[in-house]
Amino acid sequence: GQIGVVNFWATWCPPCREEIPGLIDVQKRLGPQGVQVVGVAIDSADKTREYAANIGINYVIVLGTMATVDLVRELGNKAGALPFTVILNRDGAVSGTHLGLM
């Protein structure tokens, strides 16, 4: 399995936008070694698609729903704040979380 870096973000979130270039770099450098970044956008499809294309995001982006906010809270982010990053080990288990800019 791969190591997963799951980043919950939104286009309207300044710290989210600030950390995306670093996530692009992680995917570029560590992707070949089995690291997969996945962005979960809490936003509209149109805004997400446009932003991802403009900045050149090189990793998978999926759209979250209101259930995503519940998931974030279950993972320890009680405020539901963004950005929020979850690290998954090669077995798919949560090995760490980080709230805020990385």
Q: Which residue stretches match the model-derived regions?
A:
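Short active-site neighborhood of thiol/selenol oxidoreductases, capturing the structured segment around
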Residues: G1-P14, L23
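Hydrophobic beta-strand anchors of alpha/beta hydrolase catalytic cores
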Residues: V5-V6, V37, T85
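Conserved hydrophobic/aromatic "anchor" residues
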Residues: F8-W12, Y51, N58-Y59
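Active-site-proximal beta-strand/loop segments in catalytic clefts of secreted hydrolases
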Residues: F8-W9, V40-D43, G64-T65, L101
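Proline-centered helix-kink/hinge sites
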Residues: P14-P15, P21-D25, V60, P83, ...
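Structural microenvironment flanking redox-active thiols in thiol-disulfide oxidoreductases
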Residues: R17-G56, M66-R73
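Thiol/disulfide oxidoreductase modules built on the thioredoxin-like
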Residues: A53-N58, G64-M102
